[in-house]
Amino acid sequence: MYCTRKINADYTWVGADCRRLALFEGVFGVPDGVSFNSYLLTDEKTVLFDTVDNAVRTTFRENVTHALAGRTPDYLVVHHMEPDHAAEMADMARLYPDMTILCSAAAKNMIAQFFDAELAARVTVVKEGDTLCTGRHTLRFIAAPMVHWPEVLMTYDKTDKLLLSADAFGSFGALNGSLFADEVDFDRDVLDEARRYYANIVGKYGAQVQVVLQKAAGLDVQMLLPLHGHVWRRDLGYILGKYDLWSRFEPETQGVMIAYASVYGNTENAANILACRLAERGVKVKMYDVSVTPSSYVVSDAFRYSHLVFAAPTYNGGVFITMDELLRDIASHGLQNRRFALLENGTWAPVTARQMAALIEPLKGWQQVGAPVTIRSAAHEAQMQAIEQLAAAISGDISGENQ
């Protein structure tokens, strides 16, 4: 049975929630589910914006059929070719043989790759600045390459002043019936998943996001319709401000994220001592055991916090496996402008601090705070002083006392 929601007089959400998908893109856990958003414009001409993942195709088809109310779609606008938004394209084309497919030139090539040349031949290519009049509505296409694939388009509806923003401004998490961001406590219930979505899906492409934000600033945008997560119809400055901050790689929170790996608990103990000394100084601290917490959550808070501490034992002459993976993951997302500190452990040859520093060294705008702390097997009184000094250095750096 269909499950749709009206956005305004002419736009209808025809997407679907999915709570059965364990891993988004095969790697990111989504314990609270995810929404695959698609939108239908019913005017003199009808326009379907994107399709959905195969996981929700049955609900999607029922939604589209209901929202069309006996009509057929004149156009399918393809903003993004990733299969979680384009999987149903071929089926829609078979169901509606007279429907015109609109997409970028790069997307047309991808249609031939994901599907076949016959489907690609039905495409009309649109580019930056092209417009489509559907009757009452005039749509303008906006190129948004590498947010986060090269073929991405966005669509601005000049009439209703809304921006269909592809993967930008999205979030992990099912909608649970609440389509609009103002229907939930976004700060409390959604922001962490919006940040985790941004950091892991879009985060590498901060410069490209800045270009899109500049384009949006030149438009009168009163509503944002992303391909995942909530529709924004109020307080757009909130999410636009978050994207501006994240895409400039500026921290949201002055505080410390401590990410640690520990084989037998001794490195964890040292990390806990450091956390206590920081908290005593009034510093906000978040801790993760990187062997337990999936990397996407740690990467997300690396985007959030101003200061990062990495603590790990030496393992087979190198950085402990899960810490090595985390640091490479952070590097692959191109995170910039962070202050960091290191804590290493080793029973006979502690070398982890140097090796972690080497993984961090290529990252832009990263600066080390304090001297690395070395633990030999377990922390003793001699190391307590070094940990105390590191806590003082970090707290002083946050407060500006070290400047």
Protein language model regions, located:
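Conserved beta-strand hairpin/beta-sheet module of binuclear metal-dependent hydrolase folds
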Residues: T4-T65, M154-D157, K161-S165, T267
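Metallo-beta-lactamase
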Residues: R5-A9, C103-V152, Y205-V211
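Active-site metal-binding motif and surrounding structural segment of the metallo-beta-lactamase
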Residues: E44, A55-L102
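Structural motif
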Residues: K45-V47, Y75, H137, K161-L164, ...
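Active-site neighborhood of phospho(di)ester-bond hydrolases with catalytic His/Asp-centered motifs
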Residues: F49-T51, P73-M81, I101-S104, L163-A166, ...
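Short acidic active-site motifs
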Residues: E88, T293-V298
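Active-site-proximal loop/helix segment associated with metal-binding centers of metalloenzymes
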Residues: H148-V152, A168-G203, S247-P251
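FMN-binding flavodoxin-like domain, especially the glycine-rich phosphate-binding loop
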Residues: L175, F186-L224, H228-V231, I273-Y288, ...
